[in-house]
Every structure is written in structure tokens, then in C-alpha cells.
């Protein structure tokens, strides 16, 4: 099936034009079923060699938030602890071990064999892509998102990924946004400021 039909204006508004980065959320839980549905969308987004290096931790419990709290910057702590869900968007630097399953028509694993540092860049780049897919998938499902990078990655890695090749990238608060927490919308660069034709 060719993807030839554009989304309608309402869908584009929900995903991009009227969507906002949320700083406050309604006191409404997000079910595990919705979070599983979210991942089922995210996993279809393209990554190099279908590598899918992102790993997601959906922090919803009081114990999980308490474990996360010491890593948060002062300005992000209150809103993160109050959010129904905080997603740790991370990436597995040994993602290549799953390539024989994920990319069976070529020996893609051999492309990334060797020291872990040599594949860390690909894990970070493609895991970042998947984190962006997560934000858009959340909006598509009627959730609001508040992505941020104001935290101590080393502390998150020690608390959630100790002894593994998984590294945190950024956090995304999820829930049903409270407009009272929004700032006035900031401008964006125009096409001519940010892009060009060659």
C-alpha cells in the first residue's frame, strides 16, 4: 500500500501545529494498556538497519518516581514527579545482538561488531529518532508530552540501567495536559531561516 493520502488538517494540528510541550498534567492516570498501544506504534518508525536501539522505561509508580527524583534538575523535579508517566528514553549500545532477528536479509550484526564505542553513535542517533516517534505517537493517541533533558544521565543510568549497555538519552512526561501550565507559545524559525534548496 502506497502512503499517498495526506492527513487532514485536524490530525496535523493534533500532531504538530496546536500540540504543546506540557508542564502540568491532569490528575488522570494513563493505563498500561495505553502505554503498550503507544509502543506498538513507536516500533514501526524507521531506524537504520531496522535496529530499533531505543529502550523505554515507563515510570509510573511512587517507587519509580522516588528512584528518579535524585537525578532531576531543580526546575524539572516538581512537574516530573507530578506527571502520570515519565518515560526514560534510552538506547542499548549492544543493539546489534538483535540484528540477526530484526534484519535477517543481511549480516548487519557484523557491521557493528567490535568495541562498543564504535556503535554508540548509531545507538544514540536511532534511539533519538525513536524518542521523537514516541512523542508523535503519544499525541496521536490523545496524550500530551513534555520532553526534557534537564537531568543527570549518569544518575539515571546508575539507578535504572546499572550493569547493562543501556544509556539514558532524555525524559518525556506523559499524560493529559493542563493548559494552566502552559507558557505563551514561542515562535519558530521560518523556512528561509532553517532550510534551503540545493
UniProtKB/Swiss-Prot annotation:
Q: Name one Pfam family in it.
A: Nitroreductase
Q: Does the keyword NAD apply?
A: yes
Q: Which GO molecular function terms does the record list?
A: oxidoreductase activity
Cofactor(s) for this protein?
A: FMN
- Asked whether the UniProt record includes NAD among its keywords, one would answer yes
The record's annotation in SUPFAM superfamilies points to:
FMN-dependent nitroreductase-like (SSF55469)
For the protein in the UniProt heading, the enzyme class is oxidoreductase
Against InterPro entries, the record matches this protein to:
Nitroreductase (IPR029479), Nitroreductase-like (IPR000415), Nitroreductase_HadB/RutE (IPR050461), RutE-like (IPR023936)
UniProtKB keywords: Flavoprotein, FMN, NAD, NADP, Oxidoreductase
The EC code for this enzyme is: 1.-.-.-
Family the UniProt entry places it in: Belongs to the nitroreductase family. HadB/RutE subfamily.
Protein name, per record? Putative NADH dehydrogenase/NAD(P)H nitroreductase XOO4267
Q: Lineage of the source organism?
A: Bacteria, Pseudomonadati, Pseudomonadota, Gammaproteobacteria, Lysobacterales
Amino acid at each position: 500500500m502506497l502512503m499517498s493520502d495526506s492527513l487532514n488538517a485536524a490530525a496535523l494540528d493534533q500532531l504538530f501545529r496546536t500540540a504543546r510541550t506540557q508542564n502540568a498534567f491532569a490528575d488522570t492516570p494513563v493505563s498500561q494498556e495505553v502505554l503498550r498501544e503507544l509502543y506498538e506504534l513507536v516500533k514501526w518508525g524507521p531506524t537504520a538497519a531496522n535496529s530499533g536501539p531505543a529502550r523505554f522505561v515507563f515510570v509510573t509508580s511512587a517507587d519509580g518516581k522516588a528512584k528518579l527524583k535524585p537525578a532531576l534538575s531543580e526546575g524539572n523535579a516538581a512537574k516530573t514527579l507530578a506527571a502520570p508517566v515519565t518515560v526514560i528514553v534510552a538506547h542499548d549500545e549492544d543493539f546489534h545482538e538483535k540484528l540477526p532477528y530484526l534484519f535477517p536479509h543481511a549480516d548487519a550484526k557484523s557491521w557493528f561488531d567490535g568495541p562498543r564505542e564504535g556503535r554508540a553513535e548509531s545507538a544514540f542517533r536511532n534511539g533519538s529518532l525513536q524518542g521523537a516517534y514516541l512523542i508523535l505517537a503519544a499525541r496521536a493517541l490523545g496524550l500530551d508530552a513534555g520532553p526534557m533533558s534537564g537531568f543527570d544521565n549518569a544518575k539515571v543510568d546508575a539507578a535504572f540501567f546499572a550493569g547493562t549497555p543501556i544509556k539514558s538519552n532524555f525524559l518525556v512526561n506523559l499524560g493529559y495536559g493542563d493548559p494552566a501550565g502552559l507558557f505563551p507559545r514561542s515562535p519558530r524559525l521560518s523556512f528561509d531561516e532553517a532550510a534551503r534548496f540545493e
